Amino acid sequence: MKAHICVATLAAGLTVTSCSDTGEIVGPTGVQSGARFFVSSATSVTGNLGGLQGADNRCQSLAASVGLGAKTWRAYLSVERDSDNGNRPTNARDRIGLGPWTNVNGVVVANTVADLHTRKGNADVFIDEQGRRIPGQWPGSPGPVEHDILTGSNADGTVIPGLTCDDWTSASATLAAQVGHSDGLGPGGNTANGLDSWNSAHANQNCANTAPRGGAGRIYCFAVN
């Protein structure tokens, strides 16, 4: 027999009990308590995220807003000079723990770091902390397209020099950032030439405005524990 785990919450004077067939406790928002990955719902007009610390703080705050704040969350971002790493490069793949990672609907994103960096983007898997798909090139998607997620990374999760918005501190129109496609789709659903990559599809236009080419300054957030 499949186990059902339930949690009672008080909302508008009523006790609401939520259950999960997967064995996870489900909060009033429907977020699985074991979730360890999401795309940020919060956006940024520029590539200045306040550095790695500012981006990590964003992930932590968003996680807390849906009851996942007990975990330690990190932004999937690469940098060329990390002050916490002797001003040496830090790769996004080395910031996020060892896995496995599931999204807030309980769907497995990847079991290991290696698995994560061989999979493709998917609108139904790469969702935000509230369980919503990111507007992109998937059929029926609302506009504007916002599937360009900031990473500064190659497909293997290592830093791309010159494509990190000066380590996520710059809003310069002369700098740019590497982005991935959360839905794994290019214009018209094209998946050729790396457009299906969740973390390294192409460079954005510049760090002064994340919107052109299909972005909104979103980031990927992973729980390390």
Task: Give short role names for the model-derived ranges.
Residues 1-8:
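Bacterial N-terminal signal peptides that target proteins for export
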Residues 15-18:
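C-terminal motif of bacterial Sec signal peptides marking the signal peptidase cleavage site
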Residues 21-225:
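Secreted/extracellular ectodomain signature
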